[in-house]
């Protein structure tokens, strides 16, 4: 693995350990060069309560790797989380910088009713 990826994974591991100690539901984000994925994971980490990505049929038609697509994913995951009875989450950015697509997804999820 490259140093950049190793450093990102180390940041992610440290953040996830803190969230695990607090035992909170988390909104986990992963971004690739072409897509972005979001999952709401239970406090013990054993179950995915809600998920959304640019691979969903609703979102696949438009562009999938830009800020607009991330905003749509954020709104969709917030709707699905609220339907599952989740309103408060911890934001797990998976070691990615809070910038660009990751920030757009977080802002849209907040607008959709999730509290971080």
From Swiss-Prot:
GO biological process per UniProt: translation
InterPro entries xref list: Ribosomal_uL18_bac-type, Ribosomal_uL18_bac/euk
Keywords, ordered alphabetically: Ribonucleoprotein, Ribosomal protein, RNA-binding, rRNA-binding
A GO cellular component entry from the record: cytosolic large ribosomal subunit
Domain of life: Bacteria
CDD domains: Ribosomal_L18_L5e
GO MF term list: 5S rRNA binding; structural constituent of ribosome
Alphabetized Pfam families for the sequence: Ribosomal_L18p
Entry's family note: Belongs to the universal ribosomal protein uL18 family.
Subunit note: Part of the 50S ribosomal subunit; part of the 5S rRNA/L5/L18/L25 subcomplex. Contacts the 5S and 23S rRNAs.
Function: This is one of the proteins that bind and probably mediate the attachment of the 5S RNA into the large ribosomal subunit, where it forms part of the central protuberance.
HAMAP family in the cross-refs: Ribosomal_uL18_B
Protein name (Swiss-Prot/TrEMBL): Large ribosomal subunit protein uL18
Taxonomic lineage of the native organism: Bacteria, Pseudomonadati, Pseudomonadota, Gammaproteobacteria, Pseudomonadales
């Amino acid at each position: 693995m490259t140093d950049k990826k190793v450093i990102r994974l180390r940041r992610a591991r440290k953040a996830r350990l803190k969230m695990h100690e607090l035992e909170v539901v988390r909104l986990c984000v992963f971004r690739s060069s072409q897509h972005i994925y979001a999952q709401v994971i239970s406090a013990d980490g054993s179950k995915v309560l809600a998920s959304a990505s640019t691979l969903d049929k609703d979102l696949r038609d438009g562009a999938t790797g830009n800020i607009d697509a991330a905003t749509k994913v954020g709104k969709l995951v917030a709707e699905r989380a609220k339907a599952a009875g989740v309103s408060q989450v911890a934001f797990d950015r998976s070691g990615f910088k809070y910038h660009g697509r990751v920030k757009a997804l977080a802002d849209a999820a907040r607008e959709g009713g999730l509290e971080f």
